[in-house]
Amino acid sequence: MSTPSAPETPPLPYTPAYPIRTERLDLRPVTPDDFAAIHAYQRRPEVCRYLYWGPLDEAASRASVAAKAARTTLRESGDLLQLAVVVRDSGTLVGDVTFVWKSSAHRQGGIGYVFHPDHAGRGYATEASRALLELGFEELRLHRIQAELDGRNTASARLLERLGMRREGHLRENEFLDGEWADEVVYAMLAREWRAQREERARQR
């Protein structure tokens, strides 16, 4: 009996067709003109409380924007897409999202997100993150997509659960952040779980 082969992923390099459009949002490459909007939340301590960086001063934020602007194409494992999230009707940049190509061999990806708190409660982070899952599972045909977060970041955990991701791991005191030990929590979704969720959404329409 032959062993079934894993579905092929798209050949690298891979560049999405920009903008990635959702019901209300455009996910597009970051540009230098986005500095003011991105720095407006990167400098805020409450935004960076559970992240691996920040708050950022203007120089650090300009460097961050420049790095994000260069991350528009996936070429090899470890590469990132870092995209501005813009409300289509108003043109307002409300945050940015990250898609990580973790492993070609194992068809693994990852997602991340940072949003301005002034725009919280409107579902933008959930909508943009779901677009990244769709990119990973539908376009790139990945098998598994995960997200890691500080164990104290309950708002982020709720977002991932709304997406249908499962809590897979809790690493105790795994990171030393801002002068204290912090737990790390891992959420993930498999391709078959995404397909089941997609079919359920279709039935509810």
Residue map of PLM features:
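Short, basic (Lys/Arg/His-rich) helix/loop patches that form interaction surfaces
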Residues: E138, R144-A147
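Conserved G/P- and acidic residue-centered "switch" motifs that form tight phosphate/ATP-binding loops
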Residues: G91, G123, N153, G179
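Conserved acetyl-CoA-binding loop-helix of GNAT-fold acetyltransferases
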Residues: Y113-F115, G121-E138, T154-R162
